[in-house]
Every structure is written in structure tokens, then in C-alpha cells.
């Protein structure tokens, strides 16, 4: 699964996920992409599950790019622990997603195969997504 190799600080504040994606909002590497239209978080497990769904569907063909990286640690306290005594330990990592962000890209497969692969991947993600293709001349 994806997670940072090293971090300057182990824990991070919650923050607010606002605005729309101004970077990573167009298909850059492949021919087709899966674009998020919702705001939210994708965990490393969700990204991996979607990647596996795409890989299984396209079999040996095509090349896949993952355009997001889970670099934000989410900490939780253990069950039945009293409040206080500091912040919990980092449990997993998430990628913060704004509307318009391209999550996956694919090249080397027909459009129908890419559409079906992304439909299967979208079922693994908690956000609404849409299928996009590369703009000619962009």
C-alpha cells in the first residue's frame, strides 16, 4: 500500500478540505482518466483496491497511473480509552481529494475497456467519479 517513506512530523492537524483542484485536474499521462466530482478522502486501502480492480479488468494490456498519493496521516485513539492523554497514533494515510482531481489514468486499451475498468474501480471508492478522455491539442 502507498504511504510516505519518511515524514518530518508523525502527526498532522485535521485541516479543512476546501476549493476545487487546480492541479492534477486534466489527463496528463494516459488517454483516459477517472475524475472525482466529490470532495473527500481516499485511504491507501481504497486506492489499492481500485488499482487492483483496474489491473484485473485490463489484464496484461495498458499502463496505469495513480495520480494521487496518501500523504496525510489519520490518527485514532484506541477503543474504550478516556479522553485526554494526548493525540492518538497514526493509523492510516489518506489523500485529500477536491472536485476535479484525476485519480487514475490509463493508456493502451480501447475506450470501452477503459470505461468498464474505471466503473469497477469507482465502485471501490467513496466519492462520485466521472470518466474523462484526453483533450486533443491539450
Curated annotation (Swiss-Prot):
GO biological process per UniProt: translation
Entry keywords, A to Z: Ribonucleoprotein, Ribosomal protein, RNA-binding, rRNA-binding, tRNA-binding
PROSITE patterns: RIBOSOMAL_L16_1 (PS00586)
InterPro entries listed in its UniProt record: Ribosomal_uL16, Ribosomal_uL16_bact-type, Ribosomal_uL16_CS, Ribosomal_uL16_dom, Ribosomal_uL16_sf
Biased composition (Basic residues): 1-13
Family matches, as Pfam families: Ribosomal_L16 (PF00252)
GO molecular function, one term: tRNA binding
SUPFAM superfamilies hit by this protein: Ribosomal protein L16p/L10e (SSF54686)
Region (Disordered): 1-22
Any one Gene Ontology cellular component term annotated for this protein: cytosolic large ribosomal subunit
PANTHER family registered for this protein in UniProt: 50S/60S RIBOSOMAL PROTEIN L16 (PTHR12220), LARGE RIBOSOMAL SUBUNIT PROTEIN UL16M (PTHR12220:SF13)
Record's subunit section: Part of the 50S ribosomal subunit.
This protein's name: Large ribosomal subunit protein uL16
Lineage of source species: Bacteria, Pseudomonadati, Pseudomonadota, Betaproteobacteria, Burkholderiales
